[in-house]
Design a protein with these regions (language model features):
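Acidic, metal-coordinating catalytic segment for phosphate/diphosphate chemistry
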Residues: 2-31
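Short, well-ordered beta-strand micro-motif
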Residues: 32, 107-111, 130
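Charged phosphate-binding loop/patch that engages nucleotide di/tri-phosphates or the phosphate backbone
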Residues: 144-174
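Conserved Nudix-box catalytic region and its N-terminal flanking loop in Nudix hydrolases
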Residues: 37-75, 174
Length: 174
């Protein structure tokens, strides 16, 4: 029995999804807490010039922990310690995102070693803020929910750990 492709869902503006993509894309994002207790936010065109957190796609064969360390280093130049679970969210054809997409947003809260940020070309600005100052910014919706999680739990969540077993990929693995 053959399966027909899932029907393409259109974004609110009528744009079609990425060709060939019929499944959600896993991403990681980090709310970073400095040694002074301030939170790092970045402003990006991808989210309608709203403020959010550094992060991006999880590469094939990469653990979530590896992905968050890589994305944060690429986008901010920061290294992380004490990486803790945050909320897992979904963004399905989110109107704030610049193109039709379906993301599974795997969020973490982590400490940085400092506040010396070097942005790459994905972000236009950054700010270290108190939670109250962060809430006053034009945050994208997923970041607003992540900030609410941080206000409730702080860094008091389980640590994100590497997978206990890593096997080799086999031909035909999806």
């Amino acid at each position: 029995m053959s399966r027909s492709p899932a029907p393409a869902t259109r974004a609110p503006d009528g744009a079609a999804p990425q060709p060939g993509r019929r499944y959600p894309l896993p991403t990681v994002g980090a709310l970073i807490v400095s040694p002074r207790g301030r939170l790092l936010l970045i402003r990006t065109h991808k989210w309608g010039d709203r403020w959010g957190v550094p992060g991006g796609k999880v590469d094939w064969g990469e653990s979530l922990l590896e992905a968050v360390h890589r994305e944060v280093l690429e986008e901010t130049g920061l290294t992380l310690e004490e990486v803790r679970w945050g909320p897992v969210q979904e963004a399905v054809l989110h109107p704030e995102f610049h193109r039709p997409a379906h993301f599974v947003l795997i969020n973490v809260v982590a400490r940085s070693h400092g506040e010396d940020v070097t942005l790459n070309d994905e972000a236009q600005a950054y700010a270290w803020c108190t939670p109250d100052e962060a809430e006053a910014l034009d945050l994208n919706e997923p970041t607003r929910r992540l900030l609410a999680h941080y206000r409730e739990h702080g860094l008091d969540t389980p640590p994100l750990t590497p997978p206990p077993v890593r096997g080799a990929a086999r031909d035909g693995d999806a």
